[in-house]
Amino acid sequence: MFACDNGERELPLTFGDLSQIIQDMSEKQIFDYCSNYINKIGVKKEFRKIEIDNLFQLIQIREKFFPLEPVIIKYYKEKRKSAVKHLLPITQEQINTITDGMSTKQREEFVNRRYAQLKERNYVKDAYIANYKINDSQWHEDIRFFDANEFNNKIDILVGGSPCQSFSNYGKKLGLEDVRGTLFYDYARIIKESRPKIFIYENVENVTKNDGGKTWEVMFDVWQSLGYHIEWAILDAKDYNHPQLRSRLFLIGFREDIFTKPYTFPPKMELTHRSTEYLEAGPIDDIYYLGKKGFEWITTPSKNLRRSRVNQDVIGCETANQQDNWIGDFRVEHPLPHHYTDTRIYVGQFDFGDGNGRVDAVGRKMTPRECMNLMGFDDTFKIVVNDSIAYRHAGNSIVVPVLKELIKSIIPYIS
């Protein structure tokens, strides 16, 4: 077993990186390079006021260079009270320039070392290592620089996908034009290098509709070029006895030498579970209950917002909100729980539609454990990250019961 991150954490562009990149450039070339770089990365909010001239002055190629970070901090201390605490991000193109001449393995080791130097936790790695039989040597920081050749013909099933935000109704729908969408090509590259017997690719349903279907045509052509028999379908979690409306694309590739008989996706199952079965028993901490504004937000109808409540048999789709990485699933409770003490918790009026009219009720967001449960993870799954990260992990996950049914359906092709 091994795991790859999608390289979402940004590596800083260091003084040494710039020195190496621009060492043979003229001043005009340096200026043009900085201009193009600024435009390409889409400068972050805290850097928008740094004119290109200012950046150019920071990168002097004569007698000595001046480190970027202290100068930027000084600049911002003069312009505003808050100081910038990190450098500009490095691009994949810049990494390729710096590591020119290195082997694929050496390039990956270089990138891994750079990630190790970051003074921030990799929460995805924390969750993997806490829950699966995987160690540091089996963890790869950035899929873009992962060398999969060492796994050639050693993998039975490869499961993965590219970030869904590029294609999701909740995202910008830029598809393959989004840098996150282009990670699809890295997943395809890993398949080409490692040649697994079977691979499973998961993404949002909208990937087939993006740009009038053109994105999907491009992606499908790539899949077919890899030498695999391809099957795909849109599967909904509720059709596999799991109470969540979550339609997702599942594409399965069978290596041609093992595809000896037709494949059919798992048949639909009767839904016997209810969403309330996955809620935590006992008192829920006050921090999950809503104040007046939050209660009114989830109980006021809106045509522009999809809000789901766990007061029904099947909940709406859990999603990692793209702006604050927060899952928008809520529960309205009546009778009122007796355990809470926080005076900020708001008691509002709510009609459950049961004929009893409007009653006093409180609202709360789901706990991270409940979100994990509703994605199919049982209580043995360790949550070792803070709530906001746990919500994100749950919202970005594959529904476990659906994946289990898929795995069962493809095992005969391996054995």
Regions found by a protein language model. Give the residues of each.
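Class I S-adenosyl-L-methionine
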Residues: C4, L13-D17, I21, Y37, ...
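Residues in the short beta-alpha loop(s) of Rossmann-like NAD(P)-binding domains
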Residues: G7, R121
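C-terminal target-recognition/interaction regions appended to catalytic cores
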Residues: R62, R80, Y289-S415
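Conserved SAM-binding loop
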Residues: Y128
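Glycine/alanine-rich phosphate-binding loops at beta-alpha junctions
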Residues: Y132
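Conserved SAM-binding strand-loop segment of SAM-dependent methyltransferases
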Residues: D136-E141
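Short connector loops/turns at beta-strand edges and beta->alpha or beta->beta junctions
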Residues: P163-Q165, D379-T380
